[in-house]
C-alpha cells in the first residue's frame, strides 16, 4: 500500500540515470513497464491516454467540435498563455477542455485553473503540436513521448526498497525529532551536534519551530512562508477489477476521486494471490464514510481495504513563490543552511527531479 501514491522511476537526465542505476540491478530488482494509462469518461467509455490522440474514439459530435476547435487554434497560433486555463484552451481547444482537462484538473487542484501559474507545472505539461494531434488521430498513432511513458518499479518492496537500498553504508540516525537548528559562535548545531553545513529537506513551514530565536535572520519571511499553499491526499487502498492499466484518470464530476493508481499492475508482488489492488486518490481529507459512498460510483468496482490521509503532498505556488524561496535560499546559504526537496523548496518535484536537484546542489554549491 503506497500511502502517498505509487512512485515510479524514469528520467531524461543522464547524470540522474547513471547515478541511480549504480545502486541497483536493473534487470533483477526492477520491472520495466510501458505506461498504459486510460481515462474513464462520464458515459463509462474507456479512452486511452492522452485523450488528444484518441478523439476519433469519442462521439461523432464531439469529433466535429474538436475539428472546429483545431481550425480556431490555427488562427490564434502563437498567442501566449498566462495561466493553466489559457494554456489548455490554447493547446487543446474548448471541447477537450470542458470534457476532460477542466473537470479532471479541478478535482486535482481544487481551484480555478486560471489561478494556476504555468511556472508551477514546469516540465509536467503536455506539449503536442496541432500537426501531431491531427496526424495521431488520422493514423491512430500511439504516442510514447509523454512523461513516464515507460518506467521502472521495484519487483518487491515498492518505494521503501529504494530508500532501504540507498541508505546502505550511510550513517543515519532514525526515529529522532529535529528540534533545534542553531548557529552559535560561527558554528552550526543540529540537536546539539556540531555540523559543517545543514541540508534542510523538511517542510519549510517547520523551519521556525526548529531554529532557535532568529539566529539565521529569516523572521521577515515568516508571514510569506505561513501563507504558502498546499494540498494533501487521501489514498485509499482497494481491491479492484482486474485490468491492464497503470493509471486510470477520472474526470467525472459524479464522484470526488481524480485517479486510480493500479499499483497491483506495477509488480505482481503487490497483489495477494488471485486479487488485484490499486490506490484510489482524493485531493485533501475525506472521511471513511464519504470514501465508501464515492467508491460505489467509481469504475472498476473498488472495494475498500484501508486508507491514509497525508496533509502535505502537493506544494502550490503562486506567481511570487519562486522569487521568495530564492531570496530565502540566499539568506540561509550565507549561514551554511541549504534547502532541498519538494516541500523545502516548495517545488512540485517528481522523484527524478528531486534527485537532480540534490545533484545540482552538490555540484554547484557544496563540492567547492
Task: Give the residues covered by each predicted segment.
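Dinucleotide-binding Rossmann-like beta1-alpha1 core, especially the glycine-rich loop
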Residues: 1-76
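Glycine-rich nucleotide phosphate-binding loop and flanking beta-alpha elements
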Residues: 15-16, 95, 205-207
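Hydrophobic residues embedded in beta-strands of well-ordered beta-sheets
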Residues: 46, 186-189, 337
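Glycine/Thr-rich phosphate-binding loops of Rossmann-like dinucleotide-binding domains
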Residues: 57, 208-209, 347
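Active-site/ligand-binding neighborhood in enzyme catalytic cores
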Residues: 62-184, 194, 201
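Mid-domain catalytic core of redox enzymes
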Residues: 176-295, 327, 331
Amino acid at each position: 500500500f503506497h500511502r502517498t501514491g505509487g512512485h515510479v522511476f524514469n528520467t531524461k537526465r543522464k547524470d540522474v540515470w547513471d547515478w541511480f542505476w549504480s545502486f541497483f540491478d536493473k534487470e533483477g530488482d526492477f520491472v520495466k513497464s510501458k505506461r498504459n494509462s486510460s481515462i474513464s469518461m462520464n458515459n463509462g467509455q474507456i479512452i486511452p491516454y492522452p485523450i488528444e490522440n484518441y478523439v476519433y474514439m469519442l462521439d461523432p459530435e464531439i469529433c466535429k467540435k474538436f475539428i472546429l476547435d483545431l481550425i480556431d487554434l490555427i488562427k490564434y497560433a502563437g498567442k501566449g498563455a498566462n495561466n493553466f486555463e489559457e494554456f489548455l484552451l490554447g493547446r487543446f481547444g474548448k471541447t477537450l477542455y470542458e470534457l476532460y482537462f477542466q473537470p479532471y484538473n479541478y478535482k486535482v487542484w481544487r481551484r480555478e485553473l486560471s489561478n494556476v501559474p504555468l511556472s508551477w507545472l514546469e516540465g509536467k505539461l503536455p506539449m503536442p503540436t496541432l500537426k501531431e494531434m491531427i496526424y495521431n488521430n488520422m493514423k491512430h498513432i500511439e504516442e510514447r513521448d509523454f512523461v513516464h511513458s515507460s518506467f521502472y518499479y521495484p519487483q518487491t518492496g515498492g518505494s521503501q526498497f529504494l530508500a532501504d537500498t540507498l541508505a546502505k553504508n550511510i550513517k543515519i540516525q532514525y526515529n529522532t525529532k529535529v528540534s533545534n537548528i542553531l548557529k552559535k559562535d560561527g558554528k552550526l548545531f543540529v540537536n546539539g551536534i556540531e555540523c559543517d553545513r545543514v541540508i534542510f529537506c523538511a517542510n519549510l513551514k517547520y523551519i521556525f519551530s526548529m531554529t532557535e530565536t532568529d539566529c539565521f535572520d529569516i523572521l521577515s519571511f515568516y508571514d510569506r512562508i505561513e501563507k504558502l499553499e498546499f494540498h494533501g491526499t487521501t489514498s485509499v487502498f482497494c481491491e479492484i477489477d482486474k485490468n491492464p492499466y497503470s493509471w486510470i484518470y477520472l474526470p467525472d464530476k459524479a464522484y470526488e476521486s481524480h485517479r486510480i493508481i493500479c499499483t497491483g499492475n506495477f509488480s505482481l508482488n503487490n497483489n495477494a494471490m488471485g486479487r488485484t489492488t490499486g490506490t484510489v486518490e482524493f485531493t485533501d481529507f475525506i472521511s471513511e464514510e464519504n470514501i465508501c459512498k464515492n467508491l460505489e460510483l467509481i469504475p472498476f468496482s473498488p472495494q475498500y481495504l484501508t486508507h491514509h490521509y497525508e496533509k502535505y503532498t502537493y506544494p502550490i505556488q503562486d506567481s511570487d513563490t519562486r522569487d521568495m524561496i530564492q531570496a530565502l535560499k540566499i539568506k540561509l546559504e550565507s549561514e551554511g543552511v541549504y534547502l532541498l526537496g519538494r516541500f523545502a523548496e516548495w517545488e512540485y518535484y517528481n522523484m527524478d527531479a528531486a534527485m537532480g536537484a540534490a545533484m545540482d546542489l552538490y555540484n554547484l554549491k557544496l563540492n567547492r
